[in-house]
């Protein structure tokens, strides 16, 4: 398992155990995060960047963020560990 996968697993477990501290998991918050991610996806398409494969770690990170499993700060920290 690479460092990003390891940190994601640890973060998911810690957030679940702590009751998702400081993460708004309401339907409205999920909708807002989904709208923001859709905006970023459109922006990336315009810039010519390919969408990540649906089963990739990057795509799973976005889904976990939208669902409120990880915070924006945690998303960024894990994304920085992705291989380039």
Give a label for each model feature.
Residues 2-67, 71-84:
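Acidic, Ser/Pro/Thr-rich low-complexity regulatory regions
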């Amino acid at each position: 398992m690479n460092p990003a996968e390891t940190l994601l697993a640890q973060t998911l477990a810690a957030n679940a155990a702590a009751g998702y501290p400081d993460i708004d998991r309401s339907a409205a918050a999920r909708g807002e995060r989904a709208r923001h991610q859709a905006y970023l996806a459109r922006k990336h398409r315009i810039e010519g960047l390919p969408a990540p494969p649906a089963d990739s770690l990057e795509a799973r990170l976005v889904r976990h963020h939208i669902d409120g499993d990880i915070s924006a700060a945690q998303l960024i920290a894990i994304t920085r560990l992705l291989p380039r």
